[in-house]
Amino acid sequence: MKVILLRDVPKIGKKGEIKEVSDGYARNYLIPRGFAKEYTEGLERAIKHEKEIEKRKKEREREESEKILKELKKRTHVVKVKAGEGGKIFGAVTAATLAEEISKTTGLKLDKRWFKLDKPIKELGEYSLEVNLPGGVKDTIKIKVEREE
């Protein structure tokens, strides 16, 4: 029996593939558990259409991420924090703080998960920060942590 897989199934195939499996396996396991549906040309067209929509969505997401990255790379972003003598920050600068401060200055909507910090920043200075945007867009931006006057 021909089936179209609705999910990835180990040792059978990936989502959207058309596979030939035994009737019993299809009727007693794959179809009742929602892993597959019986093959029809209409269902195949619908799945191809869904894949095309998903592909366009990912492409649009990638383009949007590239625009955001281009805007982020234009300048060194300054984050002002309260600090004591010797450049020690009261508290720490986290990814959430960075996203919030950079959003204020650029007007972009940024997510804290896009900024990769191994550990929070606890001293004043300049840093290179890795940014992982949706759509697989990655690069580094420069930030400068300064004392608040």
Swiss-Prot record:
The keyword Ribosomal protein applies. GO terms for biological process: translation. Gene3D superfamilies: Ribosomal protein L9, C-terminal domain, Ribosomal protein L9, N-terminal domain. GO terms for cellular component: ribonucleoprotein complex; ribosome. One of its GO terms (molecular function) is rRNA binding. Pfam families: Ribosomal_L9_C, Ribosomal_L9_N. InterPro entries: Ribosomal_bL9, Ribosomal_bL9/RNase_H1_N, Ribosomal_bL9_bac/chp, Ribosomal_bL9_C, Ribosomal_bL9_C_sf, Ribosomal_bL9_N, Ribosomal_bL9_N_sf. PROSITE patterns: RIBOSOMAL_L9. Keywords: Ribonucleoprotein, Ribosomal protein, RNA-binding, rRNA-binding. Binds to the 23S rRNA. Belongs to the bacterial ribosomal protein bL9 family. This is Large ribosomal subunit protein bL9. The gene is rplI.
